Amino acid sequence: MSPTISHKDNSRHQELVGGEGDKEALLRDPGTGDFSKPPRSCRAELSSILLLLFLYVLQGIPLGLAGSIPLILQSKNVSYTDQAFFSFVFWPFSLKLLWAPLVDAVYFRNFGRRKSWLVPTQYILGLFMIYLSTQVDHLLGNTDGRTPDVIALTVTFFLFEFLAATQDIAVDGWALTMLSRENVGYASTCNSVGQTAGYFLGNVLFLALESADFCNKYLRFEPQPRGIVTLSDFLFFWGTVFLITTTLVALLKKENKEVSVGKEETQGITDTYKLLFAIIKMPAVLTFCLLILTAKIGFSAADAVTGLKLVEEGVPKEHLALLAVPMVPLQIILPLIISKYTAGPQPLNIFYKAMPYRLLLGLEYALLVWWTPKVEHQGGFPIYYYIIVLLSYALHQVTLYSMYVSIMAFNAKVSDPLIGGTYMTLLNTVSNLGGNWPSTVALWLVDPLTACRIFIIILFLQLCKKLGGSCVTALDGYYVESVICVFIGFGWWFFLGPKLKKLQDEGPSSWKCKRNN
């Protein structure tokens, strides 16, 4: 609904938002170093842990900025068709599996396997942000009063996210060799904390400081016509940070030379793609992929459109962004609680049980949007309104994480341990795409469904003529779409849900990939 600091199961999440846990780290052997050495303490590797944390913070900045643009566009009254087009920006993190083998296999040995991609990618990101800081006001129509150039913004931020996804691949790989085997578990913590902090800086903090109303109300003694920072200021600052820190990493941080590079790593590019095709052709995997690609259609209107509708109805975008902050403790605790119920042999039962509640919350979201203009008072909203929005969002998070954790548990359960990293990443990529494409379609359909139609149904055509062809009622496509999505969702739950649950009864052999050595 509103932008969330975590990127789970969401186009912004894209969450997320990037994606639903497509991390293969810790499933692969980090190397074949000298294990005769005594274990290294966490304190001994504190500098490496802090560097990893900072790299993940940098990674979260582009994610947060991209997540803030739809809210800025909505405040400028762009069409939902334009919003749908811009939503393609959030796809690269779900598609990075397509070029991840290339990043793993092609590098300059003398410079370092991971630095060969990390350093140029972050330099390009930094230069890109600095250049974009000179153009973004024009692209948003801030300088000449024109409508935003959505096509140019989409292309720009798509490249932005593509670079961030590539940086993510490089950092994930480096994390496995930068830390010793005893401390490699901290890599996932750095990832989670760093991305969350970066997303917070690029989304929540930026939207708050960019808002003149928020700054005048909470941060200033004298009102000003603009916020403390602008998007161009923000981009220039972080572009400079990218350039400076990347230079320091390139000069001062050396990769671990003790980690040997196996022969399979230098010629694994074609082998990896062949392996992916072999996995996806298995009947059980193919059935799972088709089901999970359609499972989230019922949530698409609620997840992709509701937050934009609230902005359209007058809710300040920075207030919506700040509502994500109290959700952070819940988002940390929920997976720990839910994992107790998904640890058994049938984790998808939780997915199936949570689905109808999440669908019904979609209707509750529609009611919330309908109610919003009725409680607006003197250009603002009472505190009880925000409490209700927060409670609605919290309930939504419970159902979302129940489904998310159960899918992750199932993916981990069925993945062939011999190729666990590739297998898990493929299943999680499909799960991410299952959330991305319905969100894009849902945004695209709002405008066509929003129309003053002359009694759309042919049976009322004669009555329409008697009324002179005039339109009596304008129906917002969001409400139509919300109802349609819920019907589709319950149809999927009733007819296809049992098929998804039945996959849990497949034997281990159904999920094992036969490899040609």
Over which residues does each language-model region extend?
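Intracellular loop-helix junctions on the cytosolic face of multi-pass helical membrane proteins
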Residues: 1-43, 127, 133-154, 166-167, ...
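Helix-loop boundary and gating motifs at the non-cytosolic
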Residues: 28-93, 286-313, 320-323
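Loop-to-transmembrane helix entry/capping segments in MFS-fold secondary transporters
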Residues: 80-81, 176-191, 317-318, 386-387, ...
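Glycine-rich segments within core transmembrane alpha-helices of 12-TM secondary carriers
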Residues: 89-97, 125, 185-217, 324-328, ...
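Helix-to-loop junctions at the C-terminal end of transmembrane segments
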Residues: 95-112, 210, 331-356, 372-373, ...
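A membrane-interface helix-boundary motif in multi-pass transporters
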Residues: 111-119, 208-240, 349, 444-488
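C-terminal ends and interior cores of transmembrane alpha-helices
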Residues: 118-146, 356-382
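Intracellular juxtamembrane helix-capping segments at the cytosolic ends
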Residues: 162-179, 400-422
